[in-house]
């Protein structure tokens, strides 16, 4: 006799659907963070201090929100913010752009 096909566990199917939604949401957040970070670095390389600092603050805000919602670990978020700020500051100093009022200390 042919064996019956095993039934699906409904809770497992629901958890899988939830994980797929969560994955897309987390991926979008991380992508936005990376995009803004790259844009801030690019503007800093061009010596556009005002715009670079503005974009950097937006990226910093998104990083904090991602850490709050457990998309990023809090230490990973702190590391990303630190590296971004250091990179932007170094590039702006190299370009000779003023850092006053930007929130970047030496």
UniProtKB/Swiss-Prot annotation:
This is Small ribosomal subunit protein bS20. Residues 1-32 have a biased composition (Basic residues). GO terms for cellular component: small ribosomal subunit. The lineage of its organism: Bacteria, Thermotogati, Deinococcota, Deinococci, Thermales. One of its GO terms (molecular function) is structural constituent of ribosome. Residues 1-33 are annotated as: Disordered. Gene3D superfamilies: Ribosomal protein S20. Belongs to the bacterial ribosomal protein bS20 family. SUPFAM superfamilies: Ribosomal protein S20. GO terms for biological process: translation. Disulfide bonds: none annotated. Pfam families: Ribosomal_S20p. Binds directly to 16S ribosomal RNA. It comes from Thermus thermophilus (strain ATCC BAA-163 / DSM 7039 / HB27). Keywords: Ribonucleoprotein, Ribosomal protein, RNA-binding, rRNA-binding. The gene is rpsT.
């Amino acid at each position: 006799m042919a064996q019956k096909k095993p039934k699906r566990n409904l809770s497992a199917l629901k958890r899988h659907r939830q994980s797929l939604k969560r994955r897309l949401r987390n991926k979008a957040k991380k992508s936005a963070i990376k995009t803004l970070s790259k844009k801030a670095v690019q503007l800093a390389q061009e010596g556009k201090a005002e715009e670079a600092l503005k974009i950097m603050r937006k990226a910093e805000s998104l990083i904090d929100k991602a850490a709050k919602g457990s998309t990023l670990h809090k230490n990973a978020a702190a590391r990303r913010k630190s590296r971004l700020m250091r990179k932007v500051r170094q590039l702006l100093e190299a370009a000779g752009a003023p850092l006053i009022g930007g929130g970047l200390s030496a």
